[in-house]
Every structure is written in C-alpha cells, then in structure tokens.
Amino acid sequence: MNLQHHFLIAMPALQDPIFRRSVVYICEHNTNGAMGIIVNKPLENLKIEGILEKLKITPEPRDESIRLDKPVMLGGPLAEDRGFILHTPPSNFASSIRISDNTVMTTSRDVLETLGTDKQPSDVLVALGYASWEKGQLEQEILDNAWLTAPADLNILFKTPIADRWREAAKLIGVDILTMPGVAGHA
C-alpha cells in the first residue's frame, strides 16, 4: 500500500487536538514511514502576506489579482517553524519534490519570492510544520480505524473552503463523515 498523493481523513473518534477532523495530504510514503501536511487547520491570525512580511519578501512586480490573504495551515506537530509549500508545477525551485504529476512540495525561499507575482504557481497552499509516521505506524493507525484514505483531489486540496475539506474528502469515497458513529468496527 502506497498512500503518496492520498488524503488521510480523520475518523470521528480521533480526538487528538491536532488531528481531530483533519485531512492530511500524504507527500511521501515508503517502507521507512510516511510524511504529510494537514491541509484544513488554519493557523489563527496568520496569512500568507504575514509570512512574506516576516521574511521581508516583497512581491515584485506585484500582481494585484493574486490574493495573499489566504490562511497559513498548521501542517502538523513537527518542525512548526519550517515552511512547506504545496503547489502545482513548475517544480524548478531550489528544494522541490514532485509528489504527483500535478503536485509539488517546496521548502525553499525561492517559491515564496514568487507569491503575489505572475511567476507564482497557479495553486498554492502554505503550511508550517508537518506530520510524520514511523515504519508501520500509519498502516497500524489505519487498521485501528483512526483514518480513512482517499486518492487526493486537487480541487479539495487547493480550492474547497477549508471548513468543508474534511467532509468533501470523505465524500470522495462515498462516505458522509458527519453521519458516521464515533466508533467504527471491523467488517
């Protein structure tokens, strides 16, 4: 089972404060473990424009049609001071990993310098921090009914309102997550 470019969808019974009702986009999954970014937990009072200001990045030339007031996500409980930018191609930045044909993760400053300009990738999600699972840990959590999985959908990742992403991700596999019981069994 390789869940790269998939969503993890928290089951209703998962009550961990960080992962409760979360949607995690899996960026890497292999025999050593998994790494992902939570895509539906906005950080309070932190927008992309705020990150650019803190880093003293001024978009030039500024394209006013590109909104920089989008929230920054809490990507996960690890390295919360590090930025992870999920975006559509191109992937010609200093530190980019192509996750799928249509999704790239970049951790270098050069992608931030394109935000708000005509060089910005068409779709962007900025997160601080990430989530990680050791070898076999994620698979066990799935067996323990902590997570549903679904192939990633770029519309949900980049365009669906943040508050709707949990429910919409579950709908990808025909589940109305809001009507699920708090505890699930095994069939």
UniProtKB/Swiss-Prot annotation:
GO terms for cellular component: cytosol. Signal peptide: none annotated. Pfam families: DUF179 (PF02622). InterPro entries: AlgH-like. Disulfide bonds: none annotated. Belongs to the UPF0301 (AlgH) family. This is UPF0301 protein YqgE. The gene is yqgE.
